[in-house]
């Protein structure tokens, strides 16, 4: 599918960000609340950095890891820089972040919805299948099938009174100009 991007101009990324990418409901409150309580957050995605960097910056993630689309002379090449961030790479990121923060992996909460998230979800102390495909959800002890991302706050023991409802960015990630 990435090969279909071959020769598309880079400005298409800004158009997609503006017209097609929306934040999941509750994302801003989730991140603002966790940051206000001293949590470290990382966005680890099988998507592309051209999108995740802007999303991570708008929400205040501490780290962002995703696949890098290769570009040349202002156009996409239809190729992805190696290594590909897939199932094993997500586990490695969890291990790396936990080690860097001197955490036991059992102190980590990971969230995902696809088969490439299962390794990470099983490795984390709290692995949450969020609106996941049935084949993924059935392999996880914690599942959120309804509700928004603030459900993750309740799982961590926050009360609604602890939520930060006035986060700095409760809108779409902004395209670069």
Task: Give residue ranges: language-model regions.
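Helix-loop "lid/cap" segments that line or gate small-molecule binding pockets
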Residues: 1-4
